[in-house]
A protein has these predicted regions:
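Membrane-anchoring alpha-helices and their flanking helix-loop junctions
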Residues: 1-96, 112-255
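Conserved SAM-binding loop
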Residues: 100-112
């Protein structure tokens, strides 16, 4: 099961479409997942229903926050510019940080986070979100592994033999290489995930959709600003490489 080049290049768009479809399912199924679970566990007339709802929202917050934490940890070693790049980078094998415990920590974290964000959707939306995103992540994993195997050869085969694919080992399975994590850029690259966790947590306390919407909007705008900054840096780097090649070409033509 392997994603196409189109799926990988436009994975952010596909994830956004799946989220839109999942939350749009409220038009068909009007019952929120948390509400449904509260009714199922304590009943619609129970005096403890608000406490149960807050508990489930707190659990959703923990799922998303844990996912954001693991994604930040992984991005600190992989680099946010690589995480959010449309191109597949397979020239270097990363074997530090969470990559010593699981081969695909970012996808593992995304699946865990989806369990939390899915609780904010309807029952049908939860099924759509968790099912479709998990399938997409598994397809993306398949494509990445195929290219890593092609590029890295025996080194990746050994890495794959020792390190679990998606379910992390509690203990490191390979020695680290001593790479230094870049925490600042990693955190900025996961601002939206952290914002989503904060928004759900705030809603669990206040039960006010406006508070959640404001936090999500601010986090999303900050995330877009960071992506624009990464794109600007990539443009500058391309210009530097282009100018360097032009200088070398002129020097080669000079008698």
């Amino acid at each position: 099961m392997r994603a196409t080049a189109f799926e990988f290049r436009h994975r952010a768009l596909l994830i956004g479409i799946i989220y839109w479809l999942a939350f749009s399912a409220y038009a068909i199924d009007h019952t929120n997942s948390v509400q449904a679970m509260v009714i199922w566990t304590v009943g619609s007339s129970s005096p403890h229903r608000l406490l149960a709802a807050r508990g489930l929202l707190g659990l959703a917050t923990l799922f998303v926050a844990f996912g954001a934490l693991v994604r930040t940890w992984g991005a600190a070693y992989l680099r946010a510019s690589v995480v959010h790049d449309a191109k597949l980078h397979s020239a270097v094998l990363v074997a530090d940080g969470p990559y010593r415990h699981v081969r695909h920590p970012l996808y593992f974290a995304s699946i865990v986070s989806t369990l939390g964000t899915g609780l904010m959707a309807s029952r049908l939306g939860f099924v759509i979100m968790v099912g479709a995103l998990t399938l997409l992540y598994l397809r993306l994993v398949g494509r990445e592994e195929a290219q890593l195997h092609e590029q890295q050869g025996e080194a990746y085969r050994e890495f794959r033999r020792r390190v679990p694919r998606l379910w992390p080992s509690l203990t490191p399975r390979v020695p680290g290489t001593g790479a230094k994590p870049q925490w600042g850029q990693a955190f900025r690259g996961e601002l939206f995930m952290w914002g989503f966790a904060l928004a759900i947590g705030a809603f669990a306390v206040t039960f006010k959709f406006t508070v959640m919407a404001v936090i999500l909007s601010l986090a999303f705008l900050a995330f877009l600003a960071f992506l624009a900054f990464l794109a600007f840096l990539a443009f500058l780097q391309q210009q530097i490489v282009h100018n360097r090649r032009r200088r070398m070409a002129r020097q080669a033509q000079t008698p």
